[in-house]
């Protein structure tokens, strides 16, 4: 069983994309970033959970990590290229590029990938908080007949959020509860948080992802599905002894009030 909620959502992105239409051919995909999350995606291939997809290439700045995943494919009789550059990866002409690296990586290769005719499934949604980059990505995808699939991460209900936002006059807020250990290494961490509950951040989604570039991608995902990063108000709370993550998105307009409240045991 897969215990990481983000990865379950990522695998579901694949399943939903193809199971809503008639299959016509095998799709090829590549992975950028070969850490723990990429390993879980490749494991899904090995276990036959993505039967309509073939992993044909991997890229990582740590070559040994890419070689490990390619080795797993070799064990099941599949060829998977270990690429030393993103250009080399795109030369494989994959249908889809799966990004499990970082927002910086997405900024680096998103436009070249889309121009290559390669759609993207990304976990590093935080990069899309930048409006100019977001617009460039959307325009490039449209011009090249490609798409960017945003994994919802540790929340959901994006269809509801989108509907409420399109109705007009909507406001939205995002509440995230974490344990203090999950915030170690960030600018807000203090030892007192181990014994005292504390609100460590209030602001919008743009400010949140700037301060926590790898911790709150989900706030940007929810904001892009609704009111936008500038308008999405974010509160992050640290609670002593708390394990996992609580993500609660709330949206209101003149006619609708919706709440999506999800707890995940793995932060």
Task: List each model region and its residues.
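Active-site-lining helix/loop region of Rossmann-like oxidoreductase modules
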Residues: 32, 40, 149, 154-267
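Conserved N-terminal Rossmann-fold NAD(P) cofactor-binding segment
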Residues: 63-92
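Rossmann-fold NAD(P)-binding glycine/threonine-rich loop
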Residues: 125-145
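General beta-strand structural signal in soluble alpha/beta enzymes
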Residues: 99, 122, 148-152
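Beta-loop-alpha module in the N-terminal Rossmann-like domain of NAD(P)-dependent dehydrogenases
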Residues: 84-115, 127-130
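N-terminal Rossmann-like dinucleotide-binding module
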Residues: 23-74
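A short helix->loop->beta-strand "cap" motif at the edges of active sites that frequently abuts
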Residues: 116-118, 144-146
């Amino acid at each position: 069983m897969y215990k990481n909620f983000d990865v379950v959502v990522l695998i579901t992105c694949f399943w939903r994309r193809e199971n809503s239409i008639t299959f016509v051919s095998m799709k090829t995909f590549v992975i950028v970033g070969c850490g723990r999350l990429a390993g879980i995606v490749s494991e899904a291939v090995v276990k036959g959970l993505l039967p309509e997809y073939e992993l044909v290439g991997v890229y990582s700045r740590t070559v040994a990590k890419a070689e490990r995943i390619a080795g797993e494919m070799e064990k099941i009789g599949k060829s998977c290229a270990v690429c030393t550059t993103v250009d080399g990866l795109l030369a494989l002409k994959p249908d889809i590029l799966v990004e499990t690296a970082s927002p910086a990586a997405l900024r680096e290769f998103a436009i070249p990938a889309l121009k290559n005719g390669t759609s993207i499934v990304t976990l590093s949604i935080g990069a899309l908080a930048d409006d100019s980059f977001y617009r460039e990505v959307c325009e490039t995808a449209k011009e090249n007949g490609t798409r960017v699939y945003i994994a919802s991460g540790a929340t959901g209900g994006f269809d509801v959020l989108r509907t409420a936002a399109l109705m007009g006059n909507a406001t939205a807020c995002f509440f995230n509860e974490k344990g203090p250990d999950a915030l170690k290494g960030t600018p807000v961490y203090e030892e007192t948080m181990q014994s005292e509950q504390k609100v460590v951040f209030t602001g919008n989604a743009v400010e949140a992802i700037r301060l926590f570039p790898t911790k709150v991608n989900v706030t940007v995902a929810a904001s892009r599905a609704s009111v936008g990063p500038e308008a999405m108000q974010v509160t992050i709370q640290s609670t002593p002894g708390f394990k996992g993550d609580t993500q609660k998105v709330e949206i209101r307009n003149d006619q609708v009030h919706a709440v999506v409240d999800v707890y995940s045991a793995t932060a």
